[in-house]
Amino acid sequence: TLIALLLTVAGCAEVQRAGEDIARQSGNPRLAGAIHGVGNVVGSLFPIGYEEESSIGQAIALQVVARYGGVVDQPELVRYVNLVGRAVANTDRPDIPYRVAILEDESINAFAAPAGYIFVTRGLLKQIRNEAELAAVLGHEIAHVSQKHILDVIQRSKRLAGVTEAGLSYATSNPAAFKSVIDGAVKKLLDEGLDQGKETEADMVGELFATRVGYDADAYVGLLTRLRDLKGDDRALFKTHPNFSARIDAVQKTIQGKHLAATGVLLQERFSRMTKRV
């Protein structure tokens, strides 16, 4: 069954708990099932439509939640972070219902899965000082979705060709086929990281997303600079992204080249009030 297929992706007990957590936070109870319509994914990945993207995103999201120990259960905080995310997510893909979850993990990182699943760790939230910085981080992850970076990785996967050729019947009768696609995407997302070009594009596009709704353009540079100063340019601090100096340079060039306003709002007081229990 499709549920059995999902359970092979991330382990039964962990997936069930993760599904319940993310379903509660997103307000979408179907996410506990997570893999509805997955047969269509492997039958029509070229091009990937939203229904297929959603199934892929749900499967990846559950793996992220399971690996990072679940999500923070603070409804007011989660609602606030989602409101900031939705303000920033006025992208060229209005079909995407973006939702943000906070991972119960002290590492400093953030992730995005297809179909609008955005994750920030508790550790990263502790490093953020104002709402403009939060908006820039969320803008970066939203850009990964709007630019279809993870879907591009999946489409380029050599393993995918064999799965698509086999089609629907192969996927439903051979869970390992779909699992290999998802596992490859998760490995790229969580362990290896996207290529530097995609990360640079996400920084630039995310900066545009955040500043066009009024957030200060220099806020992101401030955050990246502080993160760099924690351990120099040690990539292990933010292991799935390029080094901070390169990112800071690229963002500054975007600010100058696009004439972005460094006079936008920071909203430090509101951010501090809403995140005091992080």
Q: Where are these predicted regions, by residue range?
A:
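Bacterial N-terminal signal peptides
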Residues: T1-A10
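A Zn2+-metalloprotease active-site environment signal
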Residues: C12-V278
